[in-house]
């Protein structure tokens, strides 16, 4: 199985696209089976079926509601692997250990 990440920002164009690339690089280097997509906060509900983890800045993460086996990771600096990396890995290792190589 592959853990599916959705990067969310206010407009879905700038920050989430960069965050998508940073998360992809980080998870590839961490040997995690994954896919990463991005969208605007207003579109996240239509993208939930294809995501296991939603990653967003802390102020946007508070607006995101999920149910079931889906998780939201709020980060202060969504462009810094030093900030989002440990939080994201913690959720993956706890809830998606089969994706850690």
Curated annotation (Swiss-Prot):
Question: What name does the UniProt record give this protein?
Answer: Ascorbate-specific PTS system EIIB component
Question: What keywords is this UniProt entry annotated with?
Answer: Cytoplasm, Kinase, Phosphoprotein, Phosphotransferase system, Transferase, Transport
Primary residence: cytoplasm
Domain comment from the record reads as follows: The PTS EIIB type-2 domain is phosphorylated by phospho-EIIA on a cysteinyl residue. Then, it transfers the phosphoryl group to the sugar substrate concomitantly with the sugar uptake processed by the PTS EIIC type-2 domain.
Keyword Cytoplasm in record: yes
Write down which residues bear the modification named Phosphocysteine: 9
* Domain named PTS EIIB type-2: residues: 1-100
Report the superkingdom from the record: Bacteria
**What biological function has been recorded for the protein in this entry?**
The phosphoenolpyruvate-dependent sugar phosphotransferase system (sugar PTS), a major carbohydrate active transport system, catalyzes the phosphorylation of incoming sugar substrates concomitantly with their translocation across the cell membrane. The enzyme II UlaABC PTS system is involved in ascorbate transport.
User: What organism does the UniProt record list as the source?
Assistant: Escherichia coli (strain K12)
What is a single molecular function from GO for this protein?
Answer: protein-phosphocysteine-L-ascorbate-phosphotransferase system transporter activity
Q: Which gene carries the instructions for this protein?
A: ulaB
Induction remarks: Induced by L-ascorbate. Repressed by UlaR.
Record-listed E.C. numbers: 2.7.1.194
């Amino acid at each position: 199985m592959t853990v599916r990440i959705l990067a969310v920002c206010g407009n879905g164009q700038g920050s989430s696209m960069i965050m998508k690339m940073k998360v992809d690089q980080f998870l590839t280097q961490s040997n995690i089976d994954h896919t990463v997509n991005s969208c605007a906060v207003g579109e996240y509900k239509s993208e939930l079926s294809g995501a296991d983890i939603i990653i967003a800045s802390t102020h946007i993460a508070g607006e995101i509601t999920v149910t079931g086996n889906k998780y939201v990771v709020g980060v202060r600096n969504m462009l810094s692997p030093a900030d989002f990396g440990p939080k994201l890995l913690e959720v993956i290792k706890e809830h998606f250990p089969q994706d850690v190589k």
